[in-house]
Amino acid sequence: AEVQDKGEFLAEGGGVR
């Protein structure tokens, strides 16, 4: 759960979105 592209990493719990 790292800052990949947007703030959706914390919402999705995934990778690059």
Swiss-Prot record:
Conversion of fibrinogen to fibrin is triggered by thrombin, which cleaves fibrinopeptides A and B from alpha and beta chains, and thus exposes the N-terminal polymerization sites responsible for the formation of the soft clot. The soft clot is converted into the hard clot by factor XIIIA which catalyzes the epsilon-(gamma-glutamyl)lysine cross-linking between gamma chains (stronger) and between alpha chains (weaker) of different monomers. One of its GO terms (biological process) is adaptive immune response. It is found in: Secreted. GO terms for cellular component: extracellular region. Keywords: Adaptive immunity, Blood coagulation, Coiled coil, Disulfide bond, Hemostasis, Immunity, Innate immunity, Secreted. It comes from the Eukaryota. A long coiled coil structure formed by 3 polypeptide chains connects the central nodule to the C-terminal domains (distal nodules). The long C-terminal ends of the alpha chains fold back, contributing a fourth strand to the coiled coil structure. Cleaved by the protease thrombin to yield monomers which, together with fibrinogen beta (FGB) and fibrinogen gamma (FGG), polymerize to form an insoluble fibrin matrix. Fibrin has a major function in hemostasis as one of the primary components of blood clots. In addition, functions during the early stages of wound repair to stabilize the lesion and guide cell migration during re-epithelialization. Was originally thought to be essential for platelet aggregation, based on in vitro studies using anticoagulated blood. Heterohexamer; disulfide linked. Contains 2 sets of 3 non-identical chains (alpha, beta and gamma). The 2 heterotrimers are in head to head conformation with the N-termini in a small central domain. This is Fibrinogen alpha chain. It comes from Sus scrofa (Pig). The lineage of its organism: Eukaryota, Metazoa, Chordata, Craniata, Vertebrata.
